[in-house]
Curated annotation (Swiss-Prot):
Protein's organism: Acetivibrio thermocellus (strain ATCC 27405 / DSM 1237 / JCM 9322 / NBRC 103400 / NCIMB 10682 / NRRL B-4536 / VPI 7372)
The protein's required cofactors: Zn(2+)
Lineage: Bacteria, Bacillati, Bacillota, Clostridia, Eubacteriales
PANTHER family: ALLANTOINASE (PTHR43668:SF2)
Gene: pyrC
Protein name: Dihydroorotase
GO MF, any single term: allantoinase activity
Length: 426
């Protein structure tokens, strides 16, 4: 197969220009100008961007246990439509992904039903109860790419310290959901003007920041890397920026909703904008964008969190936290980061391909010859209107319905197989 005449961008190989890509037996074998083939599929990519397949370091596939929200088949269909070729799924399933049986189940089901590469993340604590460490070696050898109790914080500092020590033995990333539950205290949105106007219990930004500070200190103390999930506040960004300057091995991610939306999106009790950590203020949004620009924030993840309509169609206090993200993440990043000049395409590829692969220790996120052909082809300028009813995800809980965005995904190739062709899932 030949991908012809597209604008290829891959910071890992310092590629940024009009090139052809030759794919043979699912492997990238040549990148250069004017490559010819006598027979085989030719994809004409003139006027489009050709990027390494996107890698999502943080999503929820809800399988096993919550298949009424999403399963591995529908989740990976949605990922493919959004240009993602590799995704890492969080362990808050039922049963929790805290042992090799669940890891193997996810890997095998993804091989059977999956449209993209799926990598399980194991739980830090058994049952995500925060009491006893999972068998981290067992998780790693079964195929887990990281450990996290995402959805819940690790409340005990000594348990988190031990998790870091074990993670360094087994060379596996630790991803921390930073939330002080005592401070969050049952809040349902960001504490501020809008929570006051709506009469809802607020979550102070300090609930995130205190745990970010703790985890930075534990990482510094143990000399083991830590990765902070879904950073949403100005002070969190500042704490991580300062820690990096001191040489602490801390990395972090944010999600599109934290650089696009503020807590005003919750007005009129819009449960589609209810998420954890909550949407913050304009000042926080600007700080997150600044953190992306200066490299403090390494990764853009989706935190794709599908919920059944019935779980959102209730009073704000009772609604589930989270939003689907696969099919809007790249267009939101293009529209709100690349178009205004905050990031170049090359920097965006670092945050959505190169750095997530590095965190998870997987051989993805680049178009190097010899690598499997995971490739995403995007029209940077094409404008479209988000329609949640067209999402391939089982769940449609997105606050972005009706948004005008740039950046349509035209093709997604996974291991050399075309799974999305001309914006249609095959």
């Amino acid at each position: 197969m030949l991908i012809k005449g597209g604008h290829v961008v891959d910071p890992k190989t310092n590629t940024n220009g009009i090139m052809d890509i030759l794919v043979e037996d699912g492997i990238i074998t040549e990148i250069g100008k004017d490559i010819e083939i006598s027979n085989g599929d030719i994809i004409y990519a003139e006027g489009k961007l050709v990027l390494p397949g996107l890698v999502d370091a943080h999503c929820h596939l809800r399988d096993p246990g919550f298949e009424y929200k999403e399963d591995i088949e529908t989740g990976t269909m949605s990922a493919a439509m959004g240009g993602f070729t590799s995704i890492a799924c969080m362990p808050n399933t039922d049963p929790v992904c805290d042992n090799k049986a669940v890891v193997k189940y996810i890997i095998n089901k993804a091989k059977q039903d999956g449209y993209v590469n799926v990598y399980p993340i194991g739980a830090i604590s058994k049952g995500q109860k925060g009491e006893e460490l999972s068998e981290i070696g067992e998780l790693k050898f079964a195929g887990a790419v990281a450990i996290s109790d995402d959805g819940k914080p690790v409340k005990s500092s000594s348990l988190m310290k031990r998790a870091l020590e074990y993670s360094s033995m087994f060379d596996i990333a630790v991803i921390s959901h930073c939330e002080d539950l005592d401070l969050a205290d049952g809040g349902v949105m960001n504490e501020g003007y809008w929570s006051t106007v709506m009469g809802l219990k607020g979550i102070p930004s300090a609930a995130e920041e205190i745990m970010v500070a703790r985890d930075i200190i534990l990482s510094e103390y143990t000399k083991v890397p830590i990765h902070i999930a879904h950073v949403s506040t100005e002070l969190s960004v500042e704490l991580i920026r300062n820690a990096k300057k001191r040489g602490v091995k801390v990395t972090c991610e944010t999600c599109p909703h934290y650089f696009v939306l503020t807590d005003e999106a919750c007005k009129d009790f819009n449960t589609l904008a209810k998420v954890n950590p909550p949407l913050r203020t304009r000042r926080d949004v600007e700080a997150v964008i600044e953190g992306l620009k200066d490299g403090t924030i390494d990764i853009i993840a989706t935190d794709h969190a599908p919920h059944h309509a019935d779980e959102k169609n209730v009073e704000f206090n009772l609604a589930a936290n989270g939003m689907v993200g696969f099919e809007t993440a790249l267009p939101l990043a293009i529209t709100y980061l690349v178009k205004p000049g905050h990031l170049t395409i090359s920097q965006l590829v670092e945050k959505m391909c190169v750095n997530p692969s590095k965190l998870l220790g997987i051989n993805k996120g680049t178009l190097e010859t010899g690598r499997s052909a995971d490739i995403t082809i995007v029209d940077l300028n094409e404008e479209f209107v988000v329609d949640v009813n067209k999402f391939k995800s089982k769940s449609k809980n997105s606050p972005f319905h009706g948004f005008k965005l740039n950046g349509s995904v035209y093709y997604t190739l996974v291991n050399g197989n075309v799974v999305v062709r001309e914006k249609v899932l095959l």
